[in-house]
């Protein structure tokens, strides 16, 4: 039997940082992939460069500028969303509770995740914040990422119920129910983030027959790769593929429902006798068509943005788990491109959510301006119209808005001047 490495523990402290180490006292069989016997002749700096890469990412400057722009836009957008909902009681509707939870998760992604990633790009190693910070970082980022996806999915379900099943929405979509749902979202997100968190920790470059390389600690995967593959594949299935299919189907059903209501309204108008009644109805159809087109475009944008922003994130993790240990120069270059794109789109999603869900709403924007003293009351309401409106059309129109008003039991449904400003039923 070949003798083991002789007193390897003396090597790290016995030599200067730039000195080489002799392989004469070491058993060559001790070396396993990716380490090689010639590593004993390399300096610590050369070892770090070989196995950990440059200390600063080559594309750091352009990525830093891009991230800072996303950071400014995202923090302002999510901050405005939280401010409007917290400072205005009329905005504390069931729908807006989901928007508030989504804004909080996106804010945490931008305020915690983005600066830490920039820090690691600027200094890939060593990770100087300690093991506790490593665990906390993974747990927090994984939790807020999963919570963001669950919030988007829950909001899609809420909109489907409000539009397609309006009678059920009055009894189900209450403030108490939504609070329980939001709490369940964060609990589930935390629980599902634990497996990935448990697989990470501080990892230090350790060369056989030589020991740990100084200043090489990184916050990375330390658990079994097979288990990590299972975790990332399961996460991609449950928190990307399934939500993507869900919101796509729900928004398709919403669009079909709006189209069906338009056809029913046209049939109703044709059956009316007087020219004045038909003219009034045609104007109402035009207003509702404009509102429906706006809603349809927004729903399509939501699905596209969700797919574009989250697909690279999961592709990045799956690709890394598959190419680890089998990386060629071409695969490494491809992975670097995917990794950069995934980071940009990941944080871009957190910045785009408040624009898509909140700031695109006329009433939401004007309510914020009103809170700052820069705007007037939005959505001036006419007197309730007591004509022969279709019940489904009235209820659907009343649930497409993303802001609220006084309890709907105290105020009859009204026809609004602005089709993008329909009221929202707010049973509590």
From Swiss-Prot:
Q: Name one GO biological process term.
A: calcium-mediated signaling
Q: Does the keyword Lipid metabolism apply?
A: no
Q: Which SMART domains match?
A: 7TM_GPCR_Srsx
Query: What ranges are annotated Cytoplasmic (topological domains)?
Result: 81-96, 159-181, 257-294, 361-428
Recorded topology in the membrane: Multi-pass membrane protein
The GO cellular component terms are: cilium; plasma membrane
Protein's name in the database: Neuromedin-U receptor 1
Question: Which species expresses this protein natively?
Answer: Mus musculus
Gene encoding it? Nmur1
């Amino acid at each position: 039997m070949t003798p083991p490495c002789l007193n390897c523990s003396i090597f790290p402290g016995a030599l200067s940082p730039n000195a080489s180490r002799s392989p004469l006292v070491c058993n060559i069989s001790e070396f396993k992939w990716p380490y090689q016997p010639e590593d004993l002749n390399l300096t610590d700096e050369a070892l770090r460069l070989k196995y950990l890469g440059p200390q600063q990412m080559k594309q750091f400057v352009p990525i830093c500028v891009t991230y800072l722009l996303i950071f400014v836009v995202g923090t302002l957008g999510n901050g405005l969303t939280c401010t409007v909902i917290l400072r205005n009681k009329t905005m504390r509707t069931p729908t807006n509770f989901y928007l508030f939870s989504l804004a909080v998760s996106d804010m945490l992604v931008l305020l915690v995740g983005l600066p830490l990633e920039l820090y690691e790009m600027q200094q890939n190693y060593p990770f100087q914040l300690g093991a506790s910070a490593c665990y906390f970082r993974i747990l927090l980022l994984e939790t807020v990422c999963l919570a963001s996806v669950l919030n988007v999915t829950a909001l899609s379900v809420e909109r489907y119920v409000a539009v397609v099943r309006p009678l059920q929405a009055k009894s189900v979509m209450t403030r108490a129910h939504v609070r329980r749902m939001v709490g369940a979202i964060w609990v589930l997100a935390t629980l599902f983030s634990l497996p990935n968190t448990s697989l990470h920790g501080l990892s230090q470059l350790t060369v056989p027959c030589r020991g740990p390389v100084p200043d090489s600690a990184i916050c990375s995967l330390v658990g079994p790769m097979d288990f990590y593959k299972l975790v990332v594949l399961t996460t991609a299935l449950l928190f990307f593929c399934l939500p993507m299919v869900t919101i796509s189907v729900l928004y398709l059903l919403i669009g079909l429902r709006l189209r069906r209501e338009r056809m029913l309204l046209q049939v109703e108008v044709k059956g009316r006798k007087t020219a004045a009644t038909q003219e009034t109805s045609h104007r109402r159809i035009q207003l509702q068509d404009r509102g429906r087109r706006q809603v349809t475009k927004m729903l399509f944008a939501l699905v596209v943005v969700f797919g574009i922003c989250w697909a690279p994130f999961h592709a990045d993790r799956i690709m890394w788990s598959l190419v680890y240990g089998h990386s060629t120069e071409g695969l490494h270059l491809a992975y670097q491109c995917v990794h950069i794109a995934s980071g940009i789109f990941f944080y871009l999603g957190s910045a785009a959510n408040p624009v898509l869900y909140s700031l695109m709403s006329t009433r939401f924007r004007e309510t914020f301006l009103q809170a700052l003293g820069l705007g007037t009351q939005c959505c001036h309401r006419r007197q309730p119209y007591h004509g022969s409106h279709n019940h489904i059309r009235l209820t659907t129109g009343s649930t497409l808005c993303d802001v609220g008003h006084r309890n709907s039991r105290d105020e009859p449904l009204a026809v609004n001047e602005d089709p993008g400003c329909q009221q929202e039923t707010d049973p509590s």
